[in-house]
């Protein structure tokens, strides 16, 4: 720790911060529709992602109805079931979670948390949302074309993805790949904005080691996405060329419908490498912003400094780097060179080390804290419990010997949903409860919020713990109907019915949450400027919700790190980052 006198701290510039003239909206259209304000763009991203996410939620209910009560619902057939799987998975992983964490929280929080007036490139930021919206519309249009959306599975493996026997082989796969290409273009415009804003638009005194961990998580995830998404982009373009022009990048010589196909010489394994080189970093593109947000929620609602701030930062960076050398643990049964499995199993276990550091630091932050069991805190605790449980099952799947018999069973589905479904959604919900007062100026209803949490949290475990057991029994995933297979015990059918009932109940809780959002917007209690008594800059704006340009006439000056809670001798139990020190005081640049 290096001590620097306060009168010098304000003169430490992390970057030049010119007070540029902002674009000022001149009409309702330029203020709320074609807005260049990052806060409005964040809300647009969030609403669009939530809308398409509701579609994915409905698809999951339809799949559960079929699995729980097979043959009861005649409007669901085998082809549609495969299409539902594909669309549900792709929407949740990319169009919902990536868009919410980076496009939603990233746009709203980065400028406020670093003390900037807006993103560095507001016009490009606006374009990024509209390209994302176009990608969502192209994806959704697949429901309305002949043949419907593709049923190739959300990983889109060739040759199945473009063979004539696959549902949605005509327009469905073309629209899916086109939508992915558009999404990546839109994200690249937004992602460059996030990175440049963090590096170049921080206010005076905001050194990198004073950034809130939310910003560190979003920043690192964005850098990862800018490196990982090109692999998916290239794979999507090449697969689209295979489908439309008859090239054979990924299509081997094979017999299709009794005749030798027009393809030959391609490698399906190459596509799997490209997809998972994107796919596993994508897990942490979603997880790292969640890690950062949870750190801020825990510190704020436990009224305690985050434990091991620098270690937490370096753990985020280490996870981001290691995530690029573990992708092939998704391919143990793909036919790749067997000895590669030992390398990727080793790197998979190594990445657990920085992840464990974060978990221990969260626990130590809670230790002897003044814990307030607010709704955001409940969701943060729910995330930690869920992520640890999901991570422990990941240790099984990271081991080659164990993964082979569990591959393509419901165990994989349960693990993936705990880590990439329930855990990040817990963070999204906790973050909404936490920052909703900043966005709207009103508090969400606490009773409805706690009802929402407990039904969601307990329901998730009642869904996915039995699903792990089904996987251990050997119940396969992606089956439209299990039938009377000898290796499936009768208890599996009863468990599937139980899981379906619980899933529908959890879905009802999300409707209560939506009601809470809308009702509180008009009838919620006024929040004031800083209802959680938080230290970070977004809570120190002169207006709530923040006005155009965020900071009025003068940008804030940062004097301390982001987690000054329960400071001995202080007038209150928190000290905001922009609060000037007493005359002659000395403060460290970073903990």
UniProtKB/Swiss-Prot annotation:
GO molecular function, one term: cytochrome-c oxidase activity
UniProt: heme b 2; high-spin binding residues: 415
GO (cellular component) term, any one: plasma membrane
Cross-link (1'-histidyl-3'-tyrosine (His-Tyr)): 280-284
InterPro entries: Cyt_c_oxase-like_su1_dom, Cyt_c_oxase-like_su1_sf, Cyt_C_Oxase_1, Cyt_c_Oxase_su1_BS
Main location: membrane
Recorded catalytic activity of this chain's protein: 4 Fe(II)-[cytochrome c] + O2 + 8 H(+)(in) = 4 Fe(III)-[cytochrome c] + 2 H2O + 4 H(+)(out)
Biological process annotations from GO: aerobic respiration; respiratory electron transport chain
Ranges that cross the membrane: 40-60, 90-110, 126-146, 172-192, 215-235, 274-294, 313-333, 337-357, 377-397, 412-432, 453-473, 498-518
Localization annotation: Cell membrane
Similarity comment text for this entry: Belongs to the heme-copper respiratory oxidase family.
Protein name: Alternative cytochrome c oxidase subunit 1
């Amino acid at each position: 720790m290096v001590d620097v006198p306060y009168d010098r701290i304000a003169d430490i510039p992390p970057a030049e911060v010119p007070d540029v003239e902002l674009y000022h909206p001149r009409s309702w259209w330029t203020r709320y529709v074609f807005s260049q304000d990052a806060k409005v763009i964040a809300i647009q991203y969030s609403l669009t992602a939530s809308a398409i996410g509701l579609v994915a939620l409905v698809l999951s209910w339809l799949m559960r109805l079929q699995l729980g009560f097979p043959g009861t619902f005649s409007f669901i057939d085998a082809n549609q079931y495969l299409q539902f799987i594909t669309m549900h998975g792709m929407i949740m992983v990319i169009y919902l979670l990536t868009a919410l964490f980076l496009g939603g929280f990233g746009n709203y929080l980065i400028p406020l948390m670093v003390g900037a007036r807006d993103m560095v490139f507001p016009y490009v930021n606006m374009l990024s949302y509209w390209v994302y919206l176009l990608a969502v519309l192209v994806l959704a249009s697949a429901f309305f074309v002949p043949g419907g959306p593709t049923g190739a599975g959300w990983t889109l493996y060739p040759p199945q993805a473009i063979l004539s026997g696959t549902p949605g082989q005509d327009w469905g796969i073309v629209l899916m790949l086109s939508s992915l290409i558009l999404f990546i273009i839109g994200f690249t415009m937004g992602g460059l904005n996030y990175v440049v804003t963090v590096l170049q638009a921080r206010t005076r005194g905001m050194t990198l080691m004073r950034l809130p961990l939310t910003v560190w998580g979003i920043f690192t995830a964005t850098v990862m996405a800018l490196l990982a998404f090109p692999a998916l982009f290239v794979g999507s373009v090449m697969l689209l060329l295979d489908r439309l022009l008859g090239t054979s990048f990924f299509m081997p010589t094979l017999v299709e419908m009794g005749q030798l196909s027009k393809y030959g010489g391609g490698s399906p394994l190459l596509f799997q490498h490209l997809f998972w080189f994107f796919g596993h970093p994508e897990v942490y593109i979603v997880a790292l912003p969640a890690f950062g947000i949870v750190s801020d929620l825990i510190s704020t609602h436990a009224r305690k400094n985050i434990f091991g701030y620098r270690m937490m930062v370096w753990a985020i960076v280490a996870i981001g780097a290691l995530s690029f050398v573990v992708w092939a643990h998704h391919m143990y049964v793909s036919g790749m060179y067997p000895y590669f499995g030992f390398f990727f199993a080793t790197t998979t276990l190594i990445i657990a080390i920085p992840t464990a550091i974060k978990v221990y630091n969260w626990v130590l932050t809670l230790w002897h804290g003044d814990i307030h069991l607010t709704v955001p805190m409940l969701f943060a605790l729910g995330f930690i419990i869920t992520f640890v449980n999901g991570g422990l099952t990941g240790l099984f799947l990271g081991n080659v010997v164990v993964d082979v018999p569990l591959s393509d069973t419901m165990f994989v589905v349960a693990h993936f949903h705990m880590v990439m479904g329930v855990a990040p959604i817990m963070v999204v919900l906790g973050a909404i409860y936490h920052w909703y007062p900043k966005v709207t100026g009103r508090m969400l209803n606490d009773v409805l919020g706690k009802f929402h949490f407990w039904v969601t949290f307990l329901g998730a475990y009642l869904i996915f713990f039995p699903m792990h057991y089904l996987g251990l029994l050997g119940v396969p995933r992606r089956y439209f109907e299990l039938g009377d297979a000898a290796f499936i015990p009768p208890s599996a059918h009863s468990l599937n019915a139980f899981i379906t009932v619980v899933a529908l109940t959890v879905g009802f809780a999300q409707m209560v949450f939506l009601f809470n959002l809308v009702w509180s917007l008009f009838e919620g209690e006024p929040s004031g400027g800083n209802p959680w008594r938080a230290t970070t800059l977004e809570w120190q704006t002169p207006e709530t919700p923040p006005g155009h340009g965020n900071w009025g006439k003068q940008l804030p000056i940062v004097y301390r790190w982001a987690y000054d809670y329960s400071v001995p001798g202080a007038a209150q139990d928190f000290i905001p980052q922009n609060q000037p020190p007493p005359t002659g005081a000395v403060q460290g640049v970073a903990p």
